[in-house]
Each structure stands twice: as structure tokens, then as C-alpha cells.
UniProtKB/Swiss-Prot annotation:
E.C. numbers: 6.3.1.21
Entries under NCBIfam families matching the protein: PRK09288.1 (NF006766), purT (TIGR01142)
One BP annotation, GO: 'de novo' IMP biosynthetic process
Keyword Transit peptide: no
Protein name: Formate-dependent phosphoribosylglycinamide formyltransferase
Similarity comment: family membership: Belongs to the PurK/PurT family.
Binding site for N(1)-(5-phospho-beta-D-ribosyl)glycinamide: E20, L21, E80, D284, K354, R361, R362
List of residues binding Mg(2+): E265, E277
One Gene Ontology CC term in the entry: cytosol
GO molecular function, one term: ATP binding
Domain ATP-grasp per the UniProt entry, residue ranges: 117-306
Top-rank taxon, per record: Bacteria
Catalytic activity entry: N(1)-(5-phospho-beta-D-ribosyl)glycinamide + formate + ATP = N(2)-formyl-N(1)-(5-phospho-beta-D-ribosyl)glycinamide + ADP + phosphate + H(+)
Length: 391
């Protein structure tokens, strides 16, 4: 049952994290009459601008997080980022609070160690070789055992922060320092992974719903500096590789439990598929689904967490997204060239309305459909390039 916002019978959902992905989730929740409460570490975050009300707290502060949940008494608590006091969510779930998809899933996926050990050691899924390191001495030993090239990431980071590829052992100290600076909680534990010379990488959006497990068409993407720049759907792959990908994604999602959409990241090399990471929430590469599917990843996530069925997912055809990236310092961001960016048929824009910028930041995305993937990517890139960010 869903009531009406601001009434006694309202169904209340609290978003922990109010960025561009949370904003789309908030919109989809409101389309189904859910009262939305946004929570983030800074004011006027994108999802706060469309939520019914909002709170600014340090979400790594266990007491502050507990206090806001106890104040609002939401029926659903929906983590949309990793930087949260997850043990508080575990404790509150045990007290009866409904954490989406589960507090365990949120805690396991908050850091790379929890989910990598679940995938490789518990589920026996194929992954790259890896070591976890607390000191630079352990780090150097791991590199010598794995060899170069190898990938270094803080166990707690996002958007490529602190991530690098070591191709020369002489650069290992620099990579260690960069990883220490890039972690969400400051310096700390890192993972050193063997580099898989993959043919391509995909995000397989996997939905656990009341009527079973569902998959979106695979999404291909290009990364730069550890963050996505373009994504496209569908990624071409054989039926055999798709079946292997879906089998891996199903195992991970079923092990994490709960209802919702999961972004499962996989590497493909020939006929082999390797597990990389998973997010128990919509994925940034999945922004392409805003134009590629009848139900976007955000709509699917909301249906699943509300316990609603997903009869089918229709993919419209070759589609792409291209990031609108800017670099600078401003609290008065403006955009020009929007009309030019939307001149071509089957193009759309999403401007995230982030309140400020200090350094490099993703501020929007261009979306496009065309006759094939290459054309769709080219059209999305062209559209994105026409948007000029003014400070």
C-alpha cells in the first residue's frame, strides 16, 4: 500500500546520498507517490532539489545517521553512496529498519575487500589475482608477487579516486601515495590486483524483484582516470559470454540478498568472464538507460524495492551516454549551448544541477540513440561537446 505524501498514510523513503543517481531515484519514487527525504553531507545536492525535504549530516558519523533515521522513521532507507556508517545500518536493520537492499549488502560493498572475498573466496567466482595491503612494505611485496602491470585501488573509494595502473615498479611509491590520498576515509588499506588484458568491460544491471531475477541488456563503457566517460547499450557479445555473465551476476546478487537493482561490473577476455565489482544500487554507466529502455535503471530499482513486479524490460536499440565534465572552482555554475546540443534527433540531456565545483566534476550527461552503437556514441559525444560550462 502506498499513501499520499505529507499524510499519516504516506510511504516514506530516505535517500542516503543525493547525487545525480539519487536524484533520478527520487523522481521515480515520487512518480509512485512515495514521500522522499534526502540526506547528504552538503546542502542543495541534486536529489535534495526534488525531495520533499532534506537533511545535511556527516553520514560517516554513526550518531548523526542514527538520529536522522529515528527522527524521520522512514519505511525504506536507500543508500545511494558508499561513504556511510554502515555498521549503524546493520544495527538499525536488526532493530526493524528496512535497509535497501539489505544492510549486509551495503556493508559488504562499501569496501572492495568485503565484496572481493565474497565473490572469490565464498562464491568461487573467477577474478583477477589480488592482495590486500596495510603497509607500503606489504604493498611492494604484493606487486613483486603479482607482477606488472597491476592495478592499485583504495579499498574504500569511488569515481576512480586513488586508483592507478602500475606499469613500472619504479613508480610503485607514487602509486602507494596516490592510493593513500584517494581513499574515502583518508589513508588506509589498498587492494593490488593483477591486470586482466580484457577485450572489454561491461556493467550488467541485475534486478532482484518479487517476481525473480531480471537483466538489462549489457552495457559497455570507456573509463578514463578510473571514472566512466561514455557508456553504450547493448554491448555486442556472444550468447555464451552473455550466459556466463548472467550466471555470475545472479550468484552475486542472490548472495547479497534483498530487492533492488545491482550494477555488476565484469571483464570479458575471449570466452572468459571475470567478476570485478558490484554496487547494490543504480550505476553511473547505467545513465544510458534513461534513453535506451522503457524502464530506466532508476525506475527498475524503485519497482523492485517497493515489492512491485517487473513483467519485461524493453530496450529501444543502439544507445549511448557521454559525460559532461568540467574543471574549475565556482558556486555559480551556468550552461550554454543547450539548444545546439539538442538539435540532433533522438538526443537528450540531463544537467545534474550540482551547486558548486572545486576541481574536476561530472555535471551532466548527453544521451543519444542511433542506427548502431558507433553512431550513437558519436552523437552523444557531439551533443556533450556543445554544452559549455560557464563559471
Amino acid at each position: 500500500m502506498i499513501g499520499t505524501p505529507y499524510t499519516e498514510g504516506a510511504r516514506r523513503a530516505m535517500l542516503l546520498g543525493c547525487g545525480e543517481l539519487g536524484k533520478e531515484v527520487a523522481i521515480e519514487l515520487q512518480r509512485l507517490g512515495v514521500e522522499v527525504i534526502g540526506v547528504d553531507r552538503y546542502a542543495n545536492a541534486p536529489a535534495m532539489q526534488v525531495a520533499h525535504r532534506s537533511h545535511v549530516i556527516n553520514m560517516l558519523d554513526a550518531n548523526a545517521l542514527r538520529a536522522v533515521i529515528e527522527l524521520e522513521k522512514p519505511h525504506l532507507v536507500i543508500p545511494e553512496i558508499e561513504a556511510i556508517a554502515t555498521q549503524t545500518l546493520v544495527d538499525m536493520e536488526a532493530e526493524g529498519v528496512n535497509i535497501i537492499p539489505t544492510a549486509r549488502a551495503t556493508k559488504l560493498t562499501m569496501d572492495r575487500e568485503g565484496i572481493r572475498r565474497l565473490a572469490a573466496e565464498t562464491l568461487g567466482l573467477p577474478t583477477s589475482p589480488y592482495f590486500f595491503c596495510d603497509t607500503e612494505t606489504e604493498f611492494n611485496q604484493a606487486i613483486s608477487e603479482i607482477g606488472v602491470p597491476c592495478v592499485v585501488k583504495p579499498v574504500m573509494s569511488s569515481s576512480g579516486k586513488g586508483q592507478s595502473v602500475i606499469r613500472d615498479i619504479a613508480l610503485s611509491h607514487k602509486a602507494w601515495q596516490y592510493a593513500q590520498e584517494g581513499g574515502r576515509a583518508g589513508g588506509g588499506r589498498v587492494i593490488v590486483e593483477g591486470f586482466i588484458p580484457f577485450d572489454y568491460e561491461i556493467t550488467l544491471l541485475t534486478i532482484s524483484a518479487v517476481n525473480g531475477i531480471h537483466f538489462c541488456a549489457p552495457i559497455g563503457h570507456r573509463q578514463e582516470d578510473g571514472d566512466y566517460r561514455e557508456s553504450w547499450q547493448p554491448q555486442a557479445m556472444s550468447d555464451e559470454v552473455l550466459a556466463k555473465s548472467q550466471a555470475i551476476a545472479s550468484k552475486v546478487v542472490e548472495a547479497l540478498g534483498g530487492y533492488g537493482l545491482f550494477g555488476v561490473e565484469l571483464f570479458v577476455k575471449g570466452h572468459e568472464v571475470y567478476f570485478s565489482e558490484v554496487s547494490p544500487r543504480p550505476h553511473d554507466t547505467g545513465l544510458v538507460t534513461l534513453i535506451s529502455q522503457d524502464l530506466s535503471e532508476f525506475a527498475l530499482h524503485v519497482r523492485a524495492i517497493l515489492g512491485l513486479p517487473i513483467p519485461n524490460i524493453h530496450q529501444h536499440g543502439p544507445s549511448a551516454s557521454a559525460v559532461i565534465l568540467a574543471e574549475g572552482t565556482s558556486s555559480n555554475i551556468r550552461y550554454q549551448g543547450i539548444a545546439a546540443a539538442l538539435e540532433a534527433v533522438n538526443t537528450q540531456l540531463r544537467l545534474f544541477a550540482k551547486p558548486d565545483i572545486d576541481g574536476r566534476r561530472r555535471l551532466g550527461v548527453a544521451l543519444a540513440r542511433d542506427i548502431d552503437i558507433d553512431s550513437a556514441v558519436s552523437k552523444a559525444l557531439d551533443s556533450a561537446s556543445k554544452v559549455k560550462v560557464i563559471f
